[in-house]
Amino acid sequence: MAIVTLLALQFTSPGPTLVEIGPLSIRWYGLLIASAVLLGISLSSRLARRRDIDPNAIADLAVWLVIGAIPAARLYYVAFEWQQYASRPAEILAIWHGGIAIHGAILGGTAALILFARRRQTPIWQLTDVVVPSLALGQAIGRWGNFFNSEAFGTPTDLPWKLFIPIDRRPLAYIQSEYFHPTFLYESLWNLLLCLLLIWLFRQGLRQRLPLKAGVMTCIYLIGYSLGRIWIEGLRTDSLMLGSLRIAQMVSIVAIAFGVLGLVWIYGLKRSLPDVVRPAISGESRSEL
């Protein structure tokens, strides 16, 4: 019922700034990213207990991920939109103005996670499996930053859940259109459902209802997120392009292939990774998950 009510709303951004105190300002985008990181640490710490990973290590990992993911997300975006920054290189650092790419964040975060895992001598797949639910949750939260910045929206629409875009934020091709697909909302809901699915799979594995192996949740994330992104990206008006191809869709297709091949490798070829999920311990609180 709540989702139905939400979809009946017309969305209008109040602006990118939450509050201004003299020369200082707090922007919605930064607040949402910070909230996503904190909630992600909490969730992954709970999951880590069942993967024989020190929960305290998750906070350390989060620092590595932020250092790796956010600059990579920005540089990925700038690389494909260089014409916007060539004459204003200082604007590259103005990340609070928007303009980051999740695929860049995933690449940078993955590199940071691999380095962290090697330094801590922790199996990589154990770490990725406890991180991906938090990643999906963080994406669900972070997409609302696009709403406040009036960016990353879709094509014009008259649907009840349409999004109003100020004239100075509209593409020239749609300058006369006022309302657009709220693709931020589509992806936010998709990622939230993906997060819930991953947590459900984790719980089923703990209860030995599913033969969950290390790496499976990572593969499911790659497939699930990418399927949604291919659909949603087709609606957007500001896609990063390589010629006539949408880069996010191409990367998503590659990610799906990796996810499917990973599942085949784990289960189909009988070369599975170790089953590192501990079964639920009698008397242990299930609320930990």
From Swiss-Prot:
It comes from the Bacteria. Keywords: Cell inner membrane, Cell membrane, Membrane, Transferase, Transmembrane, Transmembrane helix. The gene is lgt. The keyword Transmembrane applies. It is a multi-pass membrane protein. The keyword Transmembrane applies. Its EC number is 2.5.1.145. HAMAP family: Lgt. GO terms for biological process: lipoprotein biosynthetic process. Its main location: membrane. It holds the Pfam family LGT. This is Phosphatidylglycerol--prolipoprotein diacylglyceryl transferase. Catalyzes the transfer of the diacylglyceryl group from phosphatidylglycerol to the sulfhydryl group of the N-terminal cysteine of a prolipoprotein, the first step in the formation of mature lipoproteins.
